[in-house]
């Protein structure tokens, strides 16, 4: 089995992959940049806030595995059903995913809002850092419910090959809501 340079060439499906993939890759890149900006904002508040934020982000990484899995499986399931001409089944799957997302989101909300100190204590024994992480997780808890629902909707759009609206939503959430509000709140006296 040999591979020659003439065996490597572009085919007609590459533009389709780029049309779907570039918006998703750009959204992922810009979302991660927005979290780096948030990290810089929090670092300006002080060591305890910065450490608490870092710990909370570790907890959130685990929490976000669930909505991310929902989104990715929804995307594949919807794409298969749309390709088979079963749009109604794809829509029902999205609604089921949203319902499942609500159940999971409420559970995550309960833990992160009422007992954010428990998952934070898995990463450190420093009480001040745990308290700061719990404060951050309390604020995140509402987003956890929303994210579990919205990610099913995003998977539905991605499954339809509509990655541009998904990208626009992600960039809007990051740079028109999350970063500006974080900056404004960080300027308040006693920001945490």
Where are these regions (language model features)?
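Small-residue-mediated transmembrane helix hinge/kink sites in multi-pass secondary transporters
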Residues: 24-27, 39, 76, 155, ...
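Helix-terminus/linker motif at the lipid-water interface of multi-pass membrane proteins
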Residues: 4, 29-62, 80-81, 118-127, ...
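Short alpha-helical transmembrane segments in multi-pass integral membrane proteins
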Residues: 1-22, 78-143, 186-192
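Alpha-helical transmembrane segments of multi-pass membrane transporters
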Residues: 108-112, 165-191
């Amino acid at each position: 089995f040999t591979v020659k340079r003439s065996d490597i060439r572009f085919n007609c499906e590459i533009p389709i992959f780029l049309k779907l993939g570039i918006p998703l890759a750009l959204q992922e890149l810009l979302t991660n940049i927005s979290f780096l900006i948030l990290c810089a904002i929090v670092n300006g508040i002080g060591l305890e806030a910065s450490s608490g934020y870092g710990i909370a982000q570790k907890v959130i990484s685990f929490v976000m595995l669930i909505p991310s899995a929902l989104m990715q499986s929804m995307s594949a399931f919807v794409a298969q059903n749309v390709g088979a001409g079963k749009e109604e089944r794809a829509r029902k799957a999205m609604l089921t995913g949203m319902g499942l997302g609500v159940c999971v989101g409420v559970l995550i909300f309960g833990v992160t809002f009422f007992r954010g100190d428990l998952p934070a204590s898995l990463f450190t024994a420093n009480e001040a850092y745990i308290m700061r992480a719990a404060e951050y997780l309390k604020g995140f808890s509402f987003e956890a419910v929303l994210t579990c629902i919205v990610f099913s909707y995003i998977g539905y759009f991605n499954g339809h090959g509509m990655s541009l609206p998904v990208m626009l939503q992600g960039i809007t959430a990051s740079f028109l809501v999350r970063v500006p509000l974080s900056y404004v709140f960080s300027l308040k006296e006693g920001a945490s």
